[in-house]
Design a protein with these regions (language model features):
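Short, low-complexity disordered leader/linker segments with a strong preference
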Residues: 1-37, 71-72, 101
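An alpha-beta-alpha
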Residues: 147-210, 229
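Extracytoplasmic "Venus flytrap"
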Residues: 32, 39-60, 83-89, 111-114, ...
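Periplasmic-binding protein-like
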Residues: 40-42, 99-111, 131-133, 175-178, ...
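Extracellular glycoside hydrolase catalytic/binding regions
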Residues: 126-163, 279-284
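Extracellular/periplasmic periplasmic-binding protein-like sensory domains
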Residues: 246-323
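Short, solvent-exposed amphipathic alpha-helices that sit
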Residues: 51-68, 91, 130, 157-160, ...
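Beta-alpha junction/loop-to-helix N-cap segments that form part of ligand/metal-binding clefts
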Residues: 24-29, 50-55, 69-141, 150, ...
Length: 332
């Protein structure tokens, strides 16, 4: 099992938040404390819950580190208000509306581009800025003047991964597998295909139905087709099953995954096997010793945090991104 770190492009964000310049999202508690509410729009249940909880973990750690903010000469307590979008495009709009009704100043999230696109219009209609943390599909912010992001885009990471397949493995044929109808999966596969084919390669694409758990047919097809690499930008749950089943089948084709596969559950599935797994990532443990020590201490001294992190103190890239997003929000 191997990892590589793709370049993270610095992105300029110019935010003009009514909430931070007026009364939106500000309130007084019973104790008299002034409060600013930051909405957390994340999947706490469903297929993307593992990633969503880890993204929230970074925000919660940052909030514990810096629980107040100075605004117009006054100190405000920062309160994180969570709303579960259920990893679902159907549930995302109501989860977004819930945050709007609770009077948040701005919103962080969500993990999962599909849910971000489904819920985003609610924030735009309310005039509340949302900061995407790891929702990489370009369509998340397209046409929505209130949705921003701090992460790289899918067209960028797909190009990096496609070129990596060519440069590392001299790949001529790529087998691409994603969930049918999933905006994130299919968007990445589309971008990957364009770059790979433009370089003279051949792409074989397949889609599996939602809630599928047996990937044997797809993996055997990848092998019989003579694929040099397998590109599967899927959810943590699907990726874990695919890696485990590929190991059982003795698949020796290198796997290339997007940012979602940089997760301790997926990486653990590949450890101790002959699976070659390469992923793109926002952050790799060791990048900031100070952050690494702080978040590990936080996880190991908080049973709930450790559970949300999958039971260990491995630092997920999305946790680092959640941490950064919180501080971007405070600076907005």
């Amino acid at each position: 099992m191997k990892k590589f770190v793709s370049l993270l492009l610095a992105m300029l964000m110019v935010l003009s938040l009514v909430a931070c310049g007026g009364d939106g999202g500000q309130s007084n508690t019973n104790s008299g404390d002034k409060v600013i509410k930051i909405g957390v729009f994340e999947p706490l249940s469903g297929d993307s819950a593992s990633g969503g909880k880890k993204e929230v973990l970074g925000m919660q750690y940052a909030n514990s580190e810096t629980p107040t903010v100075e605004l117009n000469g006054e100190t405000y307590k920062v309160e994180l208000v969570l709303s579960d979008n259920g990893s679902s495009t159907d549930k995302a709009p109501s989860a977004a509306s819930d945050l709007v009704s609770k009077g948040v100043s701005l919103v962080l999230g969500t993990y999962g581009s599909g849910a971000a696109m489904a819920g985003g219009p609610k924030f735009g209609e309310a005039g509340i800025a949302a900061i995407g943390v790891t929702c990489t599909n370009p369509n998340v912010t397209a046409g929505n003047d209130y949705y921003f992001r701090i992460c790289f885009l899918d067209n960028f990471q797909s190009a990096v991964l496609s070129n990596f397949a060519k440069d590392k493995f001299a790949a001529k044929t790529a087998y691409c597998l994603g969930e049918n109808g999933n905006e994130y999966d299919q968007g990445l596969i589309s971008y990957f295909t364009k770059v790979f084919e433009a370089a003279g390669g051949t792409v074989i694409t397949d889609s599996f139905p939602t809630n599928n758990s047996d990937f044997t047919t797809y993996l055997n097809k990848a092998k019989s087709s003579g694929a040099d690499v397998i590109f599967t930008p899927v959810s943590i749950a699907y990726a874990t099953q695919i890696i485990q089943q590929a190991s059982s089948l003795g698949i020796d084709i290198p796997f290339i995954g997007s940012d979602t596969l940089d997760d301790n559950k997926v990486l653990a599935a590949a450890q101790g096997t002959n699976i070659q797994l390469y992923v793109s990532t926002f952050y790799q443990e060791g990048g900031s010793p100070e952050f690494d020590k702080g978040i590990k201490d936080y996880i190991n001294n908080n049973a709930s945090a450790k559970s949300d992190n999958g039971g260990d103190d491995t630092i997920s890239a999305v946790t680092a991104m959640g941490y950064d997003a919180y501080y971007v929000a405070l600076e907005a």
